[in-house]
Amino acid sequence: MAHVGDCKWMSWLPVLVVSLMCSAKAEDSNCGENEYHNQTTGLCQQCPPCRPGEEPYMSCGYGTKDDDYGCVPCPAEKFSKGGYQICRRHKDCEGFFRATVLTPGDMENDAECGPCLPGYYMLENRPRNIYGMVCYSCLLAPPNTKECVGATSGVSAHSSSTSGGSTLSPFQHAHKELSGQGHLATALIIAMSTIFIMAIAIVLIIMFYIMKTKPSAPACCSSPPGKSAEAPANTHEEKKEAPDSVVTFPENGEFQKLTATPTKTPKSENDASSENEQLLSRSVDSDEEPAPDKQGSPELCLLSLVHLAREKSVTSNKSAGIQSRRKKILDVYANVCGVVEGLSPTELPFDCLEKTSRMLSSTYNSEKAVVKTWRHLAESFGLKRDEIGGMTDGMQLFDRISTAGYSIPELLTKLVQIERLDAVESLCADILEWAGVVPPASPPPAAS
């Protein structure tokens, strides 16, 4: 009886283990974005935030926390507001925006740009983002531009007063250098166009001579009709010579041989005709078979992502926490698709792209063998290995796919395909913050 009781206990043991694992995973799924499940108290606890000038190292959130999680100071020329934000690069006021530095940046604050540099102006109808603060050269400014009126008048007055001198103002030097660069660029364009046209002409001439010296098809195929025409003549002559040959052999054996040979000919012709009919019927049957349609209908960005999510939910046996997180990310993605439809990745802010590039780098997570990097993302876009080898980070990949005509929703779809939902979530949050759209409220988690 004791042995029977032990067997019953062993049969219930796997069920208890599975139930305990499911309850633990359900508890992890109830934790928020910046919360982890405390095994001691059994409750969700807030991840330790970082101070200003620091960024989080490793990952913490959604019920899990790495053992090496902590905060590290920002490197030089970068800043962070603290909390759970990563360090971002300071604004390059003079190099990128062509503006003066109003307040230099430090580890806790970003740099603030002032007015435009001399000889530059700001567009009136500029976009309401970081690119709207870029200053442009007065050489390309429309007439009567307020910022460029004093510069152009000063240059004209100075040139009229010192017409006989050899000294030039810095603005005139810049104008002279720009004009020289413009002439050089024009000469390069003309030279490249000439070389391209000459190469096309050489290729066309070579193809013309090849087609001219190539023998024509009817000349090659003229011999079989000649042979077929000679064949009936030979058979006709043999038919004419047949009676004479019969007379020359009076023996019965030889006569029987001659008379027996024509009887075999109809039989062989019937066999050949039957074989030809069989081959013809086979060819007709094979021609009537419909060819498979290899061209699939193009799928929309959102529909393909929803189909991918359904397929993942059916085939994979993942925990309820990961499924709820995937649903949250898909809801945010659906909202982002309507905001950035038709926009290329390079139209996003520089800090947003740099953050995504860092998340896709090989040094972002310690699990290098599991987490996919920007190289896997490049392979999903169909780039060749030699082209991927010439890139150093995700920023160059974003420039490449933007040049190829890919949009932001297509980039998000590829990130989901390589199982980088953390990058999708971070990029969607930055896009909504940049566009000023409130993210959709996530539904409460289902009770296990």
UniProtKB/Swiss-Prot annotation:
Species this chain originates from: Mus musculus (Mouse)
Pfam families registered for this protein in UniProt: Death_EDAR
Primary location recorded for the protein, binned into one broad class: membrane
Annotated compartments: Membrane
Glycan attachment sites: 38
Chain ranges of the Death domain: 358-431
TNFR-Cys repeat ranges, renumbered to this chain: 30-71, 73-113, 115-150
Keyword terms: Apoptosis, Developmental protein, Differentiation, Disease variant, Disulfide bond, Glycoprotein, Membrane, Receptor, Repeat, Signal, Transmembrane, Transmembrane helix
Protein name, as recorded: Tumor necrosis factor receptor superfamily member EDAR
Signal peptide extent: 1-26
Membrane topology (Extracellular): 27-187
